């Protein structure tokens, strides 16, 4: 039993010696990657990128404000009127949500989701 331990010990030592160079190259790769990552995200680009994002968000907010349904329509459960041929519903899986009421003489087609 002791002879097997004596044989196993040098084998483990040799395996460890073979693994050391592999671990060293990985540490070098990590050191090479860190400076490159810092170069990509510089402070100058960050400020201009933030300004672009803020401008884009402001545009989106303006569009959302213009599309809002007036409070009194929400309060009384009314749905806004839409024109003939306009999209009147949205399909989400098996459910269909109503976007607007179709004018007289037309109805919301459940296949095309338009006032026909």
UniProtKB/Swiss-Prot annotation:
Function: Satiety factor closely associated with the actions of leptin and neuropeptide Y; this anorectic peptide inhibits both normal and starvation-induced feeding and completely blocks the feeding response induced by neuropeptide Y and regulated by leptin in the hypothalamus. It promotes neuronal development and survival in vitro.
SUPFAM superfamilies: Satiety factor CART (cocaine and amphetamine regulated transcript) (SSF64546)
GO molecular function, one term: neuropeptide hormone activity
Upper classification of the organism: Eukaryota, Metazoa, Chordata, Craniata, Vertebrata
Residues modified as Phosphotyrosine: 41
Pfam families in the cross-refs: CART
UniProt entry tagged with the keyword Cytoplasm: no
Positions of post-translational Phosphoserine modification: 48
Compartments in which it is found: Secreted
Family assignment from sequence similarity: Belongs to the CART family.
Paired cysteines (S-S): 82-100, 88-108, 102-115
UniProt keywords, alphabetically: Cleavage on pair of basic residues, Disulfide bond, Neuropeptide, Neurotransmitter, Obesity, Phosphoprotein, Secreted, Signal
GO biological process: adult feeding behavior; cell-cell signaling; cellular response to starvation; chemical synaptic transmission; circadian regulation of gene expression; G protein-coupled receptor signaling pathway; intracellular glucose homeostasis; negative regulation of appetite
Induction note: By leptin.
Tissue note: Hypothalamus. Found in neurons of the ventrolateral part of the arcuate nucleus, in the external zone of the median eminence, and also found in terminals in the periventricular part of the paraventricular nucleus.
The protein, known as: Cocaine- and amphetamine-regulated transcript protein
InterPro entries given in the database record: CART, CART_C_sf
Record's GO cellular component terms: extracellular space; secretory granule; synapse
UniProt signal peptide: 1-27
Top-rank taxon: Eukaryota
CDD domains: CART_CTD-like
């Amino acid at each position: 039993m002791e002879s097997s331990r004596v044989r196993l010990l040098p084998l483990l030592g040799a395996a460890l010696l073979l693994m050391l160079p592999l671990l060293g190259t990985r540490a070098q790769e990590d050191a090479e990657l860190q400076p490159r990552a810092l170069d990509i995200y510089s402070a100058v680009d960050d400020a201009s990128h933030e300004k672009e994002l803020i401008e884009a968000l402001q545009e989106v907010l303006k569009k959302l404000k213009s599309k809002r349904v007036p409070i009194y329509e929400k309060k009384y459960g009314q749905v806004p009127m839409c024109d003939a041929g306009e999209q009147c519903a949205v399909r989400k899986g098996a459910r269909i949500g109503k976007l607007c009421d179709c004018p007289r003489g037309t109805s919301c087609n459940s296949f095309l989701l338009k006032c026909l």
